[in-house]
């Protein structure tokens, strides 16, 4: 059986502008440079970013600050073009979400948007190590009953691409112009989820011997 493992932020949800604003507010509060911190957040769990850039601060209290800033933003976060159609077209037991975000938060966002919800989600609190560790992707494939080699990872961050490759999976990167750092090692790159939809559907529908990501 083949499966697709989706990152969420920047892939399914168009959330990066809002998250950049949230991190900028947090950086101002703790006197860090937003331009330095923001690139380090891509693909990482928030708690891992805090530990990396502010090891002197208590992670739990800083997470609450980030959540408070996020709560002030409008909800729901917008879905990426083509996300609903793609997820609705995939067999429910053949796709999962692997995200640094919170399952509780995403359940609410997906419900508000009317997006299909998967049978398997591995969120940031479900694993000991976040991306670029492959733990999340391997956990998702195991829960789906699918071998790692039969999984297609859809990512937009270098840490996620690294995690997917380390898991032994095929990796498709969502890489809008002018192109992001660290995505060149993916097996394929597309400018948007909508542009990648055909290749993702082919991965699920095609025979193992014939299927490939261009």
Question: Over which residues does each language-model region extend?
Answer:
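Short, flexible active-site loop motifs that bind/organize anionic cofactors or intermediates
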Residues: 9, 36-39, 52, 73, ...
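Small/polar loops that bind or transfer phosphate-bearing groups
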Residues: 14-15, 41, 97-98, 155, ...
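N-terminal helical cap/lid subdomain that shapes the substrate entry/recognition surface
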Residues: 1-91, 102-103, 107, 115
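Asp-based, Mg2+/Mn2+-dependent phosphohydrolase catalytic module
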Residues: 1-2, 94, 102-214
